[in-house]
């Protein structure tokens, strides 16, 4: 193993589209760039940590394909990022993440964490149900992840001191006090953009991603390359048709 390859955190985006969209996943469903994985990767490496991203959805990777890459990269921590462009997509995409975490737990000895909207809403329930997950992040995870990566090992004693996570200690589940979210005045420094260079591509950047059909005027040729951007965190409005409200 090449020690120079060892990285602090490997962000993995699971392949959930086939279970969600079945045969439509092959050509019709959109493939979104993993916005939050990109933001977290850029945030953590901006303070000196070595990170990488595996987007199994974009590359259509099997669990065995991913395992080979994990063994090559030898990360200290695996972070499954489970989000979607819609708020409820985090729950829909959990199936792919759990499938991978169970497979990884049987084949490698690397701590596994999850960050995403589903575990933010149900951290204790997720840990009780999913034995393959070692800990989850209970909010956006920017500062909690940095603090997790600072510790020498992921023992229960060390994890108990980290704000913004829930973790297991044998058969017991614990939730720590919340970590602060990124304030507006630190948005540009603590979330300094997207780690676009870590995304996979075939011939040119972003060519593995494709827009929803209605974004491309129902023209297949216009669907790729595709990028999606978030210009803010949260929303100041209170639309009565929004599921959040």
Stretch-by-stretch model annotation:
Residues 2-245:
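Acidic, low-complexity intrinsically disordered segments
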């Amino acid at each position: 193993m090449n020690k120079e390859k060892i990285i602090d955190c490997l962000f993995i985006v699971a392949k959930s589209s086939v279970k969600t969209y079945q045969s439509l996943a092959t050509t019709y469903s959109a493939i979104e760039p993993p916005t939050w994985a990109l933001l977290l990767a850029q945030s953590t490496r901006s303070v000196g940590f070595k990170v990488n991203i595996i987007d199994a959805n974009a590359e259509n990777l099997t669990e065995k394909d991913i395992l080979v890459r994990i063994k090559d990269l030898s990360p200290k921590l695996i972070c499954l990022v489970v989000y979607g462009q819609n708020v409820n997509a985090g729950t829909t995409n959990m199936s792919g993440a759990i499938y991978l975490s169970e497979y990884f737990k049987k084949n490698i000895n690397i701590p596994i964490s999850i960050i995403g909207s589903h575990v933010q809403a149900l951290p204790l329930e997720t840990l009780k149900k999913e034995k393959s997950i070692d800990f989850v992040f209970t909010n956006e995870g920017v500062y909690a992840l940095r603090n997790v990566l600072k510790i020498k090992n992921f023992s229960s004693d060390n994890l108990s001191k980290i704000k913004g996570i829930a973790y297991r200690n044998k058969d017991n589940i614990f939730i720590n006090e919340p970590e602060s979210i990124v304030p507006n005045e630190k948005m540009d420094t603590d979330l300094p953009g997207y780690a676009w260079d870590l995304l996979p591509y075939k011939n040119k950047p972003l060519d593995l991603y494709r827009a929803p059909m209605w974004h491309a005027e129902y023209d297949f040729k216009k669907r790729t390359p595709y990028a999606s951007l978030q210009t803010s965190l949260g929303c100041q409005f209170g639309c009565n048709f929004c599921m959040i409200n």
